[in-house]
Amino acid sequence: MKIDYTVQVWQEGSQYIAHAMPLDVASSGETPELARQAVDEAVRLFLATSAEHGTLKEILEDAGYHLAAKNWRGPVWLGVEQRSCLTEV
């Protein structure tokens, strides 16, 4: 089974964070590539654990996926933007 996802990578201090969207799985590494590898492994484990518990279909549907030709298709991203908000707090 093939499940696609999009990865965002950013730096926090000396670590790089990789976030798999829309699965909401994240991991980190000392380099961007190590962070990507770590999040790929985290996604594999997350999906395997979900399948073992019988919740994979529900999790994928809640994340916006749909089943097409035996593959789960995620949302099509129209854009990724960095936004900001002014607040009184």
Regions found by a protein language model. Give the residues of each.
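A short, exposed loop/beta-hairpin motif centered on an aromatic-Gly-Thr core
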Residues: L23-L34
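Short, flexible helix/strand-to-coil boundary loops that buttress conserved ligand/catalytic motifs
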Residues: A20, G29, L60
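Short aromatic-glycine-(Arg/Gly/Cys) micro-motifs in beta-strand/loop hairpins
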Residues: I3-P22
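Short, charged, surface-exposed hinge/linker loops at domain edges
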Residues: M1-D4, E33, Q37-V89
